[in-house]
Design a protein with these regions (language model features):
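Catalytic loop of short-chain dehydrogenase/reductase
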Residues: 13-20, 93-128, 132, 136-178, ...
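Rossmann-fold cofactor-recognition segment
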Residues: 52-69
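Structural signature of beta-strand start/N-cap positions in the alpha/beta core
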Residues: 8, 34, 84, 139, ...
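Conserved glycine-rich Rossmann-like NAD(P)H-binding loop of the short-chain dehydrogenase/reductase
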Residues: 33-47
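Canonical Rossmann dinucleotide-binding motif of NAD(H)/NADP(H)-dependent dehydrogenases/reductases
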Residues: 2-37
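Conserved hydrophobic beta-strands of the Rossmann-like cofactor-binding core
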Residues: 8-10, 88-93
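Glycine-rich phosphate-binding loops of nucleotide-dependent enzymes
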Residues: 29-31, 41, 58-60
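Conserved Rossmann-fold cofactor-binding substructure of NAD(P)-dependent oxidoreductases
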Residues: 66-81
Length: 193
């Protein structure tokens, strides 16, 4: 299948072979896409580089989405590597694990703000920078999860994903006028590719 032949895109947030974003990466590669990947820190670098190589990619970038300058540099590096890209898959999320269980009332200000920055606002900054190097007709995808119900052991992430879904609507409005699609995919935890 060559539906994506000649298309180039960035995958952000692959954690391991069991992650949804890894399944997405495999499907894109199988369809002919050329992929680049991001990682954060040495532990993820050791996992992401071998995974990228399995899909014939040697293009990996370090990117801490908590740092605006790293997002800017990421897309400058992509421009240097490829010129333009066709798509971005944003699968970046974070919360302090100790605050996912128990009562939402116990969410700390620090974890709320950090979780919202990484899990939600980073997509806005990624979209802003990606749009500078994205071809008309390009696509941006972020991953979300059931945000209409209070899910046990999800706490602050529920709020982050609700905010992310709202952000997608506004980004779709802004970037749609420039020929770029923006969507969120809400896959169940048991999704398989």
């Amino acid at each position: 299948m060559s539906l994506m032949k000649g298309k180039k895109g960035l995958i952000m947030g692959v954690a391991n072979e069991r992650s949804i974003e890894w399944g997405i990466s495999q499907k894109l590669a199988d369809a002919g896409a050329e992929l680049a990947f991001t990682y954060l820190g040495d532990a993820l670098k050791k996992r992401v580089i071998p995974l990228a190589e399995k899909l014939n990619s040697n293009i990996t970038f370090s990117c801490d989405v908590e740092k605006k300058e790293e997002i800017i540099k990421l897309f400058e590096d992509i421009k240097s590597q490829w010129g333009e890209i066709d798509f971005v898959v944003h699968a970046v999320a974070f919360s302090d694990k100790s605050e996912l269980s128990g009562e939402y009332l116990n969410t700390t200000r620090e974890n709320f703000l950090r979780s919202m920055l990484i899990s939600c606002f980073s997509f806005t900054e990624v979209a802003r920078e990606a749009s500078k190097v994205m071809k008309s007709g390009g696509s941006m995808l972020t991953l979300t999860y059931e945000s209409t119900k209070a899910i046990p052991n999800y706490n602050v992430m529920g709020g982050c994903k609700s905010a992310l879904e709202a952000s997608v609507k506004y980004l779709a409005r802004d970037l749609g006028a420039k020929g770029v699609r923006v969507n969120a995919s809400s896959a169940p935890a048991s999704a398989s590719f």
